[in-house]
Design a protein with these regions (language model features):
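Short hydrophobic beta-strand element within catalytic cores of glycosyltransferases
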Residues: 40, 273, 277-280
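A short, active-site helix/loop in glycosyltransferases that binds the activated sugar's phosphate group
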Residues: 115-121, 125-155, 162-164
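Nucleotide-sugar-dependent
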Residues: 255-269, 281-288
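Glycosyltransferase donor-sugar binding loop
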Residues: 38-45, 183, 208-221
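Conserved donor-binding/catalytic core segment of Leloir-type glycosyltransferases
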Residues: 7-9, 160, 166, 172-190, ...
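C-terminal amphipathic helix plus adjacent low-complexity
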Residues: 332, 337-443
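Nucleotide-activated donor-binding/catalytic signature segment of Leloir-type glycosyltransferases, i.e.
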Residues: 56-58, 221-239
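Conserved acidic donor-binding segment of nucleotide-sugar-dependent glycosyltransferases
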Residues: 292-303, 311-316
Length: 443
């Protein structure tokens, strides 16, 4: 039997999405239906390369998005599975491949509601099928404006989940303090801005907050020191084995800022598998994962969030009940078999359709491609309006008021990655992007 060929394309291969991708591809690889291979436009980290060698799955990394050999590979494969988030190399690939025929499915690893990770018509129209990782994404404005026939043909939703991965086998480790834990991105681009203040306000004796992850843990640690609560908080930075820390958590507190880009929230699933009650805000994908009052609490305010933590501290029987419910719910809903079956169904659906022309947004010959891709990916938001206004002054100075507006933008727009100006400027040698970069350094 000749296997059909599926080609996965990802901006880079590593981190949280990398773990989900490895689990999915490996389990698809074990089936007889499709041969799997992966192209990473940027890097594949050592963990991914070791995984590739151990399992006989080909990885090609540092592949140029404009390389004709990649375009030919995409045209020759039966299914092209693109893993989406705002990354300059991915946008460059979609633009440069436009006009060619293949069968594309895009799986979004961002929820699409907030800049710089907004969905847009160019992204939604490019594939034959667009797959979200959370039902929260189905309420995004560029999806809801489409008619029901279009959505029925082109929109699907499959949770981002790497399976139980023995997180359900974690046994609690005895400890002397009441441990409230967080794992994941430690950066205000994702975490609630009052993260430290909320923990400090919770009236819990003998408490230890264990914050696992990076990359801004050092600056947040210094903030806790300045606020006089460093004795309550332990920042670990990135760790190689998160299970060791989950074994010591009594409660999993996951307060994200409202406009975060998350989707499947794999760390929530891991906590649930381990039987740790979860506390989240009623914003975005988190409330689609946590079963309010059953596996944990979904809070509508900072006050409710703190009260939920205090309630779990003071009620041992409730914690045990929610722990058991969490394990049960995870085993029923988050095994890897479910997404594997869903993906095979989508692959078969794609095979039933002929290869079609992929059309991306066209730009005028007078438009600057790098800047146009950056602004397209950024979408309709305050940052985009400010940058467009600044560019009207290029290459001269801009009014002070406009500079100050740029300086007041959230940190995510001025970071080194995540679709920021610096991110695009690092891949495109472009004077206008370098000009815009100046205003990100004024914060």
């Amino acid at each position: 039997m000749n296997k059909k060929k599926a080609l996965h394309i990802t901006p880079h291969f590593g981190g949280g999405v990398g773990s989900v991708l490895m689990s999915l591809v490996l389990n698809l690889h074990k089936r007889d239906d499709f041969e799997q291979e992966i192209v990473s436009l940027e890097y594949a980290n050592e963990k991914a390369k070791n995984w590739s060698n151990a399992n006989g799955i080909k990885i090609y990394d540092k592949v140029s998005p404009v390389d004709n050999r990649l375009h030919e590979k995409m045209q020759n494969r039966d299914v092209v599975h693109i893993h989406f988030w705002n990354h300059p190399l991915l946008y460059q690939l979609l633009y440069s491949f436009s006009g060619r025929k293949t069968r594309v499915v895009i799986w979004s690893h961002v929820n699409g509601h907030y800049a710089p990770y907004l969905f847009n018509d160019a992204i939604l129209n490019f594939p034959e099928i667009f797959v979200t990782t959370t039902n929260f994404s189905l309420t995004q404005k560029d999806i809801t404006k489409r008619n029901s026939d279009w959505k029925s043909r082109h929109i699907r939703s499959i949770p981002s989940c790497s399976g139980l991965n023995e997180f359900d086998k974690i046994e609690p480790v005895p400890h002397d303090t009441f441990n409230i834990g967080y794992t994941g991105t430690v950066d205000y681009c994702k975490i609630h801005p009052d993260f430290i203040e909320m923990f400090n306000k919770a009236d819990i004796p003998n408490v230890q907050y264990i914050i696992v992850g990076g990359d801004s843990h050092k600056s947040m640690e210094e903030e806790a020191r300045v606020k006089g609560c460093i004795n309550k908080l332990k920042f670990t930075g990135k760790v190689s084995n998160v299970k060791e820390y989950l074994a010591e958590f009594d409660v999993f507190a996951y307060p994200l800022q409202r406009e975060n880009y998350g989707t499947g929230e794999q760390v929530l699933i891991e906590a649930m598998c381990a039987g740790i009650p979860q506390v989240v805000f009623a914003d975005g994908p988190e409330e689609y994962v946590v079963q309010d009052g059953i596996t944990g609490f979904v809070a509508n305010s900072k006050k409710e969030f703190i009260e939920a933590i205090q309630k779990l501290y003071s009620n041992d029987s409730l914690r045990r009940k929610m722990s058991a419910a969490s394990k049960k719910y995870a085993k029923e809903n988050f095994t890897i078999d479910r997404p594997v079956k869903s993906w095979l169904k989508i692959y078969q659906e794609l095979l039933s359709r002929p290869k079609s022309e992929c059309i991306f947004r066209k730009f005028e010959s007078t438009e600057d491609l790098a800047v146009s891709l950056f602004l397209l990916a950024l979408g309709e938001c305050d940052a985009s309006s400010i940058y467009k206004e600044i560019l009207q002054y290029y290459p001269d100075d801009v009014p002070l008021e406009l500079s100050e507006k740029a300086a007041r933008l959230p940190q995510i727009f001025n970071g080194n990655t995540r679709g920021s100006i610096k991110h695009y400027s690092s891949f495109f040698d472009n004077e206008k992007l370098k000009y815009l970069e100046i205003f990100g350094t004024l914060q």
